Amino acid sequence: MEPWVPQTQGRTTGPSRDTNRGLQSGHYRPRLHSQYSGDKYHQWQDAHKNSKSQQDLRDDHQQSHSVSRSGEWSQPVSGADYLKGSYPSHLYSRSGYGDPYQRYHTPTPRDEYAYGNYYYHGHPQLLPEERVARQGSPYIWHEDHGDQRYFGEHHREKHNGTFGANSDTQFQFTSKNPYRDSPASVSGQEQPGEFFPESEAQKQKPLLTSKSSLLQQHESGLSSSSYELSQYMTAAPEEYEPMVSAAWRPIQADDTSATVPKAPMRFYVPHVSVSFGPGGQLVCVPPNSPADGQTALVEVHSMEVLLNDFEDQEEMRAFPGPLIREDIHKVDIMTFCQQKATQCLKSETPGSRDSALLWQLLVLLCRQNGSMVGSDIAELLMQDCKKLEKYKRQPPVANLINLTDEDWPVLSSGTRDLLTGEIPPNVDTPAQIVEKFTKLLYYGRKKEALEWAMKNHLWGHALFLASKMDPRTYNWVMSGFTSTLALNDPLQTLFQLMSGRIPQAATVCGDKQWGDWRPHLAVILSNQAGDTELYQRAIVSMGDTLAGKGLVEASHFCYLMAHVPFGHYTVKTDHLALVGSSHSQEFMKFATIEAIQRTEIFEYCQMLGRPKSFIPSFQVYKLLYASRLADYGLASQALHYCEAIGAAVLSQEGSSHPVLLAELIKLAEKLKLSDPLVLERRRGDRDLEPDWLVQLRRKHKDLEQNRTGAPRDPDSTPSDIYGAGGTTDTPYPDLSGHQNYSEDSEYSSTLWSTAEQTSLTNPLAQQSFPLQRDTYSGHMGTPVPLYSVPATHLAVTSGASGSSVAVTGTPGGRVGEDMLRTHPAFGENTMTQEPLEDPDGLEVISSLQTPAAPRVPSFSEDSAASAKEDEEGSSDGADKPSHPDASQKGKLGDGKNTKSSGFGWFSWFRSKPASSVSTSGDEDSSDSSDSEESPRASSPHHASPGLSPTPPLTSPSLPGASTFSRGTGGSILQGSSNSSGIAEGMGIGGFSGTQGVSSEFYSQPGALPPPPTLQGAVPLYNPSQVPQLPTASSLNRPNRLAQRRYPTQPC
């Protein structure tokens, strides 16, 4: 019997015009054009130019698909075979899809075509489990693609259907789709929102402009990928028109450069936009398009209603916070705490008993207005300890008398037992024991009486007798008494505490073997007397022990009894940060709602007794609690918390918390309209803030101004301070003008603010002379070279004696290391040169305050004096000043020298800090002592071991000031008849070049050749380059230490 061949319904199958075409997969394939190219697109012949040839090809295609083999079942073809058999007269934007004549849906059941993770849905009547996502399944009925009936239906739909009449409108609408116009379409990415009719029922719908393409896609049940696939399988006869074909023409190479680059859209699929409002609202915007005729909706939901069933919100609603002393009654707080304690006792968890004890403590504190009485706390501790435990006596330990493990021996008298030969013990009555104790005292046997009383437990008689004896005996009797008690007996704890030591219970409590910790704390709290610090340390030790055992609530109970201050979460050494919560765990487990509420109640109890006694470190947790209230939709309560925190911050005048203040203002700014009063006072666009918020803003502004207006760091460079310099008056305007100084005195006072603090105390007014700016501007931070090139940069002329001071310095130093301060005295001409401390730690030694301008010892002389001190010990009589004021100031100068004894990088060069060497205040610079002038006169061209190895120089006189220079060696080189001067080899300078250097530097016979110019480097010390001090220059006392360190070079 022949197999049944499926026939077309109501139509005859015409013969094929071309018999050479072969069948593939149940229907014939059109023949490919000979010019096939696979480079970018499949090139086909343009069949749209000649309408007649295109009609012939359509007829040929119609007849070719009407032929089917008998006995073969028609199967759908794959994408690759479909490409090979595609009709050559049409361009396709995607490869792998068949001829446009075959892109019609059949009313019969079809298969689902898998495309990625999406499916092209076939007949809508099939269930999802019946639609198998496989092509060619033998259990699914398919319709032949080559059926002639569908081509006839195509003509009828073209003339009678509404889709053909409105094709222009449809393509005009879809071309404005933002998803199709996005750059993702260029890259080949699937675009949602493209619509073509899928079935006959959808073809009869009204115009597409009445509904959006996304809504049409949603109703058809197609996803973005399967919907794009359906475009190539849906009947679209309008695509044969030139306008429509151009809309779907692939982008050519010349069109790519002409396209304008567009930013890719963030979301390709419409979604709901959600935002949280500051007042506890949830704002939702559905993806409706008003351009498509849909209503734009904005949904506002209340977070309080949405989260009504959450446990955290219920817990926060039940709490009567914020706890402000004037706004809430303490009965409500006590009721809340009692309810919490009852809940903890019902839970029967390991820490529930201790947690309930904390809540009961808060009830007691609230009842007593925050006062803690030891007896009341002890009563609270002993509520659950109605049955006192029977503490067992410890086993006998080493006896205090014979150091054995035997118990106290009992004297006995009686007849010997005939069987055992032992004398049975005679049980004495209490009267007999006391009588014997008395008889021993009759004969003066105190020690035997004590032993008898201790053996027979007459501890009262023994302790009284021992108290009248020596302390050692009393301690022995006390130790014997306490050893008879159990270790975990609260009496043992009390007696140990009264003995002046930390009880053992404070270090071992919390164990099951030890027993309950509450009786021990109760006996400590109710018997506080004597050393309060000892009791507090014992309670804190007990809390630390309990915390180590994991009993956090119990340890915090002890900390509260010991009045331990609250700490911070980040400081793990603090004892507690929140009541009942350990800050050693992570923050979310630490800052729980219950812990914050407990701590706030404790703060409220303190404020009942002492108003405005806020906990400073707790305010940040209250702000966190207010933020949680706002998150759960309780905006009004959160705003009240902000007001309470603001009152606490404003009450703390001494402390400032800028970060907390800024975050508090931000949260209050968002929640301020939750207050009905603020909302009523609102006028137009102007918001009237509450008074406490205005005060917070003012305080925050003051803090910011204080931070920005703080004094600059002394290490700052002068270039940073030049811009802020000002001009101030100086008591020496003629000197400033005479020396051509810069008048930027604010720079000088700002740069040396630390030097003013370390200067010598002077009751007179202090005024610093400004420096000349261009003298040192190019040498900031340059290392100090070993060779010293004197440069005169400061001259101070004394009006009375005509003397002047010339200060020399080495190049390459920092700016302020040779800075001099003068303290003028009104009515007399007195100059004081104070040591100024450089930011790097170096200090400049200068002379003391004297009526006349005395000589200031240089670093070279200080080194020589240091070497003398090493040799002579403590005898420095020749160098001590004779004037009392100079002596006092010399001591101060010694302290400063000791502070900077290292002298920076050449600290190894000195044996010990040099003491300031100064002359008497009554001496003139021309009338120096013989002890100072004689060695200098004997060696005019030799320098002592010091920082500067250069010979004495002659500093050029500044205009109007006649000076003479005394070099580091000490000899006078040049002078004038009407003036005298002192040149100080400061050893540290901030000036460069050979500015102010005399020409005699290169002409004197004993001078060294000029050193090479060193830029940015510190040369090593070479003793051979430093001329040594001869033995005759040390006041007839050879400086052996200096000779041993630096031997004299042979001539």
UniProtKB/Swiss-Prot annotation:
Q: Which domain of life is it from?
A: Eukaryota
Tell me how this protein sits in the membrane. Answer: Peripheral membrane protein
Point to the regions of Low complexity compositional bias. Answer: 798-809, 900-920, 936-947
Report the InterPro entries cross-referenced here. Sec16_CCD, Sec16_Sec23-bd
Keyword flag Transcription = no
Cellular location of this protein? Answer: Endoplasmic reticulum membrane; Golgi apparatus membrane
**Polar residues compositional bias, start-end:** 1-23, 64-77, 163-177, 737-754, 1022-1037
Q: Name one Pfam family in it.
A: TPR_Sec16
Which tissues and organs express this gene's product?
A: Liver.
**A GO BP annotation:** protein transport
Q: Which residues form a coiled coil?
A: none
Query: Where are the residues of the annotated region Central conserved domain (CCD)?
Result: 263-708
* Primary location class: endoplasmic reticulum
Q: Residue spans with biased composition (Basic and acidic residues)? A: 39-63, 703-715, 877-897
UniProt biased composition (Acidic residues): 921-932
Q: Where is this region: Disordered?
A: 1-109, 157-203, 703-754, 798-820, 850-1051
According to the UniProt record, one GO cellular component term is:
endoplasmic reticulum membrane
Query: Where are the compositionally biased (Gly residues) regions?
Result: 984-993
* Residues the record lists as Phosphothreonine modifications: T850
Assembly and interaction partners:
SEC16A and SEC16B are each present in multiple copies in a heteromeric complex. Interacts with TFG. Interacts with SEC13.
UniProt lists the family membership as follows:
Belongs to the SEC16 family.
Q: What does this protein do?
A: Plays a role in the organization of the endoplasmic reticulum exit sites (ERES), also known as transitional endoplasmic reticulum (tER). Required for secretory cargo traffic from the endoplasmic reticulum to the Golgi apparatus. Involved in peroxisome biogenesis. Regulates the transport of peroxisomal biogenesis factors PEX3 and PEX16 from the ER to peroxisomes.
Q: What is this protein called?
A: Protein transport protein Sec16B
Gene behind this protein = Sec16b
